[in-house]
């Protein structure tokens, strides 16, 4: 039997998909702008 692939880890989640990571690059800021435009309640992890 192989193990489950999703092993939740809040710190890794934030480091990979977090708000500060999104703000770092132009593409990431574009993602946030799109999500704001769509009216998402949660912008990032």
From Swiss-Prot:
PANTHER family, sorted: LARGE RIBOSOMAL SUBUNIT PROTEIN BL34M, MITOCHONDRIAL RIBOSOMAL PROTEIN 34 FAMILY MEMBER
Molecular function via GO: structural constituent of ribosome
Xref: InterPro entries: Ribosomal_bL34, Ribosomal_bL34_CS
GO biological process, one term: translation
Record GO cellular component, one term: ribonucleoprotein complex
Family the UniProt entry places it in: Belongs to the bacterial ribosomal protein bL34 family.
Keyword entries, A-Z: Ribonucleoprotein, Ribosomal protein
UniProt cross-references to NCBIfam families, sorted A to Z: rpmH_bact
Coiled-coil region list: none
One Pfam family per UniProt: Ribosomal_L34
Gene that specifies this protein: rpmH
Protein name: Large ribosomal subunit protein bL34
Organism: Streptomyces griseus subsp. griseus (strain JCM 4626 / CBS 651.72 / NBRC 13350 / KCC S-0626 / ISP 5235)
